[in-house]
Amino acid sequence: MEKIRKIILSEKEMPRQWYNIQADMPNKPLPPLNPATHKPVGPEDLAAVFPMELIKQEVSTERYIDIPDEVLDLYRIFRPSPLFRAFNLEKALGTKSKIYYKYEGGNYSGSHKANTAIAQAYYNKEEGVRRITTETGAGQWGSAMSFACHHFGLELLVFMVRVSFDQKPGRKLMMNIYGAKVIPSPSTMTAAGRKVLEMYPDSPGSLGIAISEAMEVAVQDPYTKYSLGSVLNHVILHQTIIGQEALIQMEKAGDYPDVVIGCFGGGSNFSGIAFPFLREKLLNGKDIRLVTVEPASCPKLTKGKFMYDFGDTAGMTPLLPMYSLGHNFIPDKIHAGGLRYHGAGVLVSQLLKDGFIEAKAKLQRECFEGGVLFARTEGILPAPESNYAIAGALDEARKADLEGVSKTILFNLSGHGHFDISAYEKYFENNLPDHELSSAEIEKSLANINLPDLM
């Protein structure tokens, strides 16, 4: 029987709506709070930062939200994305399990980030915004937003986390090619950046600091808005096109996953593939596990505290109910820059608290080992972030073999690693250190946040 290695949908089969998990969550998340009053935020609290349509999506409990035609038209350049059966990887492992992966690296940004970048740029343009500010870790989000902003005629200012700015010069150049201005963060351009540099002149930066800088610039100009690449509900909403496509593709393959896996930074790529499958679990009783894999050096889901905390370092965002390591936390300089964030999205946090998803933490070298095996067998060089999902999938296959069972495993290959060659070079030079955050470090970080217990 001929092997079918990839399942490709036609453009006509691409979903026309995003799926909103808030419609089906048994326990809705606690509301974000105004940090000054500790009262739930209203649209007026967010209007200086986000366009109104995205604010509506942030709080919506409608199950499905239509994708605008202009967004669908750009999606068609690279969507639907392919679903692959990893036959060669299965053979290398000698596993009885079936491994599938949804590949999101085949677009202009090289990652899943394009799915929400296009949507956010569109809604900003529709409301008369002229410039957007944003942060980026490893550069995938900045690359995604750069092209989207150029397409819709918007200026873009990107604050790129310093350690990734230095590690990945190609990403900065890619953003420049698409028309964006890129500043290493922390910078002297903002009060938030200057404060960090005064305290820590050699700071490697963090996503929390970069968010603070981008928001500070945005609120100073009525024609400028801020855009976030993960964490928030509307960002996660836009990513659900991944899982909705995967549901159709798995059906075409005549299969259904026992477990769905995604790496975890703020929550967008994991939620994008997992939430449509969680819908099937919640509404139709499907037996499936949903597993996030995060760095052991930044383990907010596995070791963090469920609490109200800021989404940024300077305390400019609302207080969000989430698993957090503390908004002042500066992660270790791992090469998975997109996962170096102190907190978890509100939706994922609530679902983890309620037991609907699972979380695991992995060390850096094990994940790169899995990424190299994947590259050598499947012919795609994974992004360092995606290596965490690969490591999680390998774990599941090996565990199933030890138990004498065959599992169907699906993971999200969120992006390619073509700009991350230096990280792989360090891996082969045995110069890629592991770092596991200790309980003492976590306690110290949480003790420094100086916030009341609002739970």
Q: What are these model-derived regions, one by one?
A:
Residues 264-268, 272, 364-430:
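Claisen-condensing/thiolase-fold acyl-transfer catalytic domains that form or cleave C-C bonds
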Residues 119-129, 143-155, 176-177, 274-284, ...:
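Alpha-helix C-terminal capping segments
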